[in-house]
A protein has these predicted regions:
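Bacterial N-terminal signal peptides that target proteins for export
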Residues: 1-16
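Selective for proline/serine-rich intrinsically disordered segments
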Residues: 4, 23, 30-34
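C-terminal segment of classical bacterial N-terminal signal peptides
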Residues: 16-27
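A compositional/structural signature for long, glycine/proline-rich flexible linkers
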Residues: 30-449
Length: 449
């Protein structure tokens, strides 16, 4: 096939064009080779591992839940204390579910009328981010009755008087909490009135088959074998593309045995060290007088480090509007709490914990490694505002943590500990207010007796 040059093209220009075409192969041959791929650094590996681990902790629990018999869109009412995840709140009756929704089906939730008792129905996505709460604080004009949790923009016809709640996720973890208070039987009666059902026939998600590992034994390079499946769940937080690209790059690179070994070594050195360094302040939190308070919880933005640490040490945490957590792990001398020893904690009369919570407060002691409550013959695992507390003459409140009840200490002021176990205290304020809500408050020092 011949090619005719436009008549308007001058002879000089035509000569130049032909010469350029003839020389093109030579020019291409002289093009420098592409730069080698950028090496994956130890910091890249640490960042990617910590990010991915946060998701794997959720999928691990999801697989365990379904193995234990849970089914989609079914609310399971648990007996008080009968839950199996790190740092549960033992002051509430829990109900739990996994929810699947799509463009044509919502999940309907019935909430009973609850008076003078804390309650909420919390919805989280597959990364441990809280998407919604149903309670009288979020819906003061519709605190109970019928609700429908729907995929955003889903076209679903709902019954009248149903409060629709749109969420950006197809898979949801649900926790319903009802404060036990002094009348546990009433709390359990209310708990069983919370109900859940799909509005139609949703296309149910598959339970992701990712790595299952022991809670106290973090995985190494094998975590990245699950990267493709794990990242199928969208992360709603902005700016995660770069760290997700690192995850995918490492998952591809470890096909080479030598690179796999290098990544594994890097995880066990730098990534684990970075986690250990961030743990005392729960990511980017603050520590004071032996207590740590996370900078955020429940919703994390770009702080995936804190999200992963919370998923590891206290999965399903709610937002700071609902509850604020303080973790106490050291006494006034900076030494870790030992179940063999005796300690005291005194709240001044002007800063009693009840004055900083709209609903209630509690303190729980858990093993520092397993995050499970400390076993004791009394089966007493927390102290809260429902206990038979005795106040000091000056109005202050002193609590005791010891393997046996100290002399002249009221029974309600004592939380038993387990000899030989290193532990930490978790102080919760439900409906935080005042200096707790603003972040200015920190609990008093824990004194070694």
């Amino acid at each position: 096939m011949s090619m005719r040059l436009p008549a308007a093209l001058g002879a000089t220009a035509a000569t130049w064009l032909v010469t350029a075409c003839l020389q093109a192969p030579l020019a291409l041959a002289q093009t420098p080779p592409a730069a080698p791929a950028v090496a994956i650094t130890d910091q890249d590996i640490s960042d990617a591992y910590i990010y991915l681990l946060g998701r794997l902790l959720v999928t691990r629990q999801q697989q365990l839940d379904f193995k234990d018999g849970m089914q989609w869109n079914t609310l399971y009412h648990r007996k008080p204390g009968a839950v199996d995840w790190p740092n549960p709140n033992l002051d509430v009756a829990y109900s739990e579910a996994w929810v699947g929704i799509d463009e044509k089906s919502c999940t309907q939730v019935t909430v009973p009328k609850v008076v003078d008792r804390y309650y909420t129905v919390q919805f989280l996505n597959g990364w441990g981010e809280t998407l919604a709460n149903i309670n009288e604080r979020e819906y003061p004009e519709h605190p109970n009755g019928e609700f429908a949790v729907c995929l955003k923009d889903a076209k679903v016809s709902l019954p009248a008087d149903t409060q629709r709640i749109d969420v950006p996720a197809r898979t949801l973890r649900v926790l319903s909490r009802v404060e036990l208070g002094k009348d546990w039987s009433e709390a359990e009666r209310l708990q069983h009135q919370f109900k859940m059902r799909p509005s139609g026939s949703p296309q149910l998600p598959e339970v992701p088959k990712t790595l299952i590992f022991e809670g106290q034994k973090l995985p190494g390079v094998e975590a990245f074998d699950s990267a493709t499946v794990a990242l199928q769940e969208p992360d709603i937080n902005p700016g995660m593309e770069q760290v997700q690209a690192k995850v995918r790059a490492i998952a591809a690179a470890i096909a080479d045995p030598a690179e796999r070994a290098r990544v594994d070594k890097s995880i066990h050195t730098q990534a684990f060290a970075d986690i250990a360094k961030a743990s005392p302040i729960i990511g980017h939190g603050t520590a004071r007088d032996g207590w740590a308070r996370p900078a955020t919880v429940g919703t994390y933005g770009d702080d995936y480090l804190t999200r992963t640490l919370v998923n590891y040490g206290g999965i399903w945490a709610n937002t700071q509007k609902e509850v604020i957590y303080y973790r106490g792990g050291q006494d006034a001398n900076g030494k870790t709490l030992d179940g063999t020893q005796s300690y005291s904690l005194t709240f001044p009369g002007k800063q009693l914990p009840a004055s900083m919570a709209n609903y209630y407060w509690s303190i729980t002691a858990t093993n520092a490694k397993t995050f499970l409550v400390l076993p004791n013959s009394l089966n007493r695992f927390s102290v809260n505002d429902q206990a038979d507390l005795k106040y000091n003459q000056d109005g202050s409140l002193t609590l005791h943590f010891a393997p046996s009840k100290p002399q002249d200490v009221a029974d309600g002021n004592w939380l038993p500990t387990a000899p030989g176990q290193i532990y930490r205290l978790v102080l919760r304020f439900y409906g935080p207010k005042g200096d707790v809500a603003s972040g200015e408050y920190f609990p008093p020092v824990i004194k070694h007796l």
